[in-house]
Amino acid sequence: MDEDGEKRVRTKRLCSPESSDKKSGYEVDWVRDLPESLICHVLLNLSTKDVIKNCVLSTKWRYLWRYVPGLDLDCSDFTEYNTFVSFVDRFLSTNTESYLNKFKLGFDCDLVGDEETGNAQMARWINDVVKRKVQHLDLEWGALEIPPIVYVCKSLVSLKLCGVILPIPEFVCLPSVKVIVLDWVKFANDLALEMLISGCLVLKSLTLCRSNNDNVKVLRVRSQSLLSFNYNGPNTMGPEYEELIVEIDTPKLQDLTLSHRMTASFIIKNRSSLVGAHINIEFNFCFGEKFDPKNLPKREMIRNFLVGISGVKNMAIAACTLEVIYDYSRCEPLPLFRNLCLLSVEFYEDRWEMLPFFLESCPNLKSLVVGSNRYRMERTSIISGHRCLLSSLEYVEIETPLTGEVFEMKLVSYLLENSPILKKLTIHLHDNSRKKAECEILTIPRRSSSCQVILL
């Protein structure tokens, strides 16, 4: 350590053989000699707390944290709220003419005594960072109403909000926003969210995790640029959620994740570009309500939804969704999933026999991953003995460890005896019953002579 008390990062290099001093080495303080602009760019990838820790390595860097073009801070890192406020103010008052890459703040309600004052301070900070052309805005701040200036921030690239309130905008113009993540956000009404989405002209990714009382009854996702949509509905079950509707009109959408059992209706338009889908919905049948074949509007909605996702190439289906698909298939034929190559599907315990009803609608399926879930309540009885030839299936994996029960062996038999070009079947076994299951599985006839059975 030198006279400054600097803790330098050093690398030791041995002199080359041609050097006159072959036995001695020398030290190069290469980190200290890096340009400050480059160091700030590297530090931008750390939280502000970690940036400050690194700044103590050198007296030259003592105040460098103020010039890093981003703030990533959680007020829980401070013992007093006033210290937190003072820290943020000092950061924003430094180099006020420079642009900000990111502004990320987390709020701890236990630290702030006066919520109104805290919200006013946050609103002031947001106005400041928008004026400094912030690119990434990430806020977790309960009960804060986002200032209208955010709706017209031309520099913003990503917007991540948690626990805040979005007011009704007069106008939305976010020409650079590509990523939006809204977690437990409360909206003034349906229109506030719809305008936010449609006002992002180059939006690529949208993640929406809804709160129980977000004031949105009809969610319309309309975007000409959206590629990925991840939707998680309210986690509370009750009759007030039975009429929730989600309408998706995104002609370029490639990846879709839907997870909510209470949403009554999912409407998908312009679906030709869809590549991957993860579906965990059951259209309000989660209260034990059985599928009613006479409910024609419900049947039509399910039909249109299945048609809407029928062009997908890779898909995961939850057990509850498979139940709905099976019930629907007993009323009218399922649409063909001609492009589906990879399917991951769950079923409730011994109810695997509904699987063939869906597989016969997948004429080009190559890979299948199956698993079982705990059986929840009484469901529609299954027509047993239904079989279909899995003429395109090449790879199968049974993820849930088998114990050797009769229904499990029937599933394995169905897959081996009805797959003429199957190349590999991978089966996970429970340790307590491995020997018994192994013996039974190895005696099952295989329709494909080249099929390899792997037991894990």
UniProtKB/Swiss-Prot annotation:
InterPro entries assigned: F-box-like_dom_sf (IPR036047), F-box_AtFBL13-like (IPR053781), F-box_dom (IPR001810), FBD (IPR006566), FBL13/AtMIF1-like (IPR050232), LRR_dom_sf (IPR032675), LRR_FXL15/At3g58940/PEG3-like (IPR055411)
**Which spans of this chain does UniProt mark as LRR repeats?**
136-163, 185-210, 234-260, 347-372
What SMART domains does the annotation carry? FBD
Keywords from the UniProt entry: Leucine-rich repeat, Repeat
Region Disordered: which residues?
1-23
Q: Any idea where the FBD domain is?
A: 377-429
Which Pfam families does the record cross-reference, listed alphabetically?
F-box, FBD, LRR_At5g56370
Name this polypeptide is given:
Putative F-box/FBD/LRR-repeat protein At1g66300
Species annotation: Arabidopsis thaliana
